[in-house]
């Protein structure tokens, strides 16, 4: 058994694990600070995950299942600290965070790569799959997490959250602000990393409601051409 601490955003977290894979995943986030809470993966949790993945064509190792189990426990525990994890691809553009959200296969990964091609070093991928959002003194911030999707795109940084942009595939590029909170919530609900415990579920939905009423939301209908990134940029930041 190995024990170590990591720091995600401003939250120090204690980790217990039996496989070196997890410490490798978390290596960029190690800290000496005393943890606010600690998590580990028990055998029952790993067995539940093993059954969940049973229909997959892949065979998942025990160290992978341990990493997923710990990730799920972290996602639940942070809700007690005005923080929540969402399914999204988070980039930093000139130091400001933009989160792109869409169902799997829509093209989030392709879209953030277009931003990199168009804007170069002005763009940094903070987390390609599950960033952490935090609410601090009335402002939302977005941070990297050790777990960042199959591409493993991410870094240990925190940026102010400028906007959240939903992506729909379309032939032509068009971005528009979303102002109907019911539509925003219906789209955002698909991106929630929902905990099982009712108490934490209530906290998650309250956090999401505050997010909707604080951060600008957009709907980007786009293709996979470079001009899609230009359209998104101009809609969020204005034409340079």
Where are these regions (language model features)?
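Conserved lysine of the Walker
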Residues: 108
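Hydrophobic positions on the alpha1 helix immediately C-terminal to the Walker A/P-loop
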Residues: 111
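A noncatalytic interaction/capping subdomain that flanks phosphate/NTP-handling catalytic cores
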Residues: 1-104, 114-124, 132-240
């Amino acid at each position: 058994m190995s024990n170590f601490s990591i720091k995600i955003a401003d939250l120090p977290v204690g980790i217990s694990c039996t496989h070196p894979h997890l410490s490798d995943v978390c290596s960029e986030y190690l800290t000496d600070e005393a943890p606010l809470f600690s998590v580990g993966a028990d055998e029952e949790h790993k067995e539940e995950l093993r059954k969940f993945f049973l229909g997959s064509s892949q065979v998942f190792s025990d160290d992978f299942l341990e990493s997923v189990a710990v990730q799920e426990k972290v996602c639940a525990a942070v809700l007690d600290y005005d923080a929540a994890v969402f399914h999204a691809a988070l980039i930093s553009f000139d130091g400001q965070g933009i989160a792109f959200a869409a169902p799997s296969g829509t093209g989030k990964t392709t879209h953030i790569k277009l931003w990199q091609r168009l804007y170069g070093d002005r763009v940094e991928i903070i987390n390609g799959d599950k960033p952490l959002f935090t609410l601090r003194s009335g402002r939302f911030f977005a941070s990297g997490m050790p777990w960042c999707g199959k591409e493993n795109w991410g870094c240990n940084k925190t940026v102010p959250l400028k906007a959240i942009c939903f992506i729909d595939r379309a032939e032509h590029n068009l971005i528009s602000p979303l102002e109907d909170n019911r539509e925003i919530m219906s789209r955002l609900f698909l991106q929630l990393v929902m905990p099982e415990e009712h108490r934490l579920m209530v906290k998650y939905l309250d956090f999401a409601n505050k997010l909707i009423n604080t951060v600008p939301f957009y709907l980007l209908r786009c293709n996979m051409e470079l001009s899609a990134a230009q359209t998104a940029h101009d809609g969020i930041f204005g034409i340079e």
